[in-house]
């Protein structure tokens, strides 16, 4: 009986350590604001919405995006307005996706631009579920206004929060 209890405690401690590590990696910024700001292009200001071809919380792989990747709500990704796609590297099937800096509500995040949209007039970017949860953890807003989106030069950015 003692062995089962100690094994359960060890398992719980390991699970806690893993969850703390994951939580820290969510918060820890890989790129500094200064580096990102010097590597970014002209800003576009507008509204951002969230998209998921299924329903919020769905974790299965979705349909293919414009870049050919499968939609994944767990990565830092977004779809840029079709009329802006050239500014963000073309977003074409089989072409390496480009990256953008998205700023809103006092936060910054780097997202991979791997799809085109939104189709709703007045919106410039559709954030996937993970990126939108960074700005709106409850997903209650649906749309965030006064979002600043800047294309990032180069192909080797690590998507996620910017410090």
Model-inferred region functions:
Residues 1-2:
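Short, small-residue-biased leader/transition segments that mark boundaries at the very start
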Residues 6, 18-163:
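Secreted/periplasmic proteins
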Residues 10-18:
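Hydrophobic helical h-region of N-terminal Sec-dependent signal peptides
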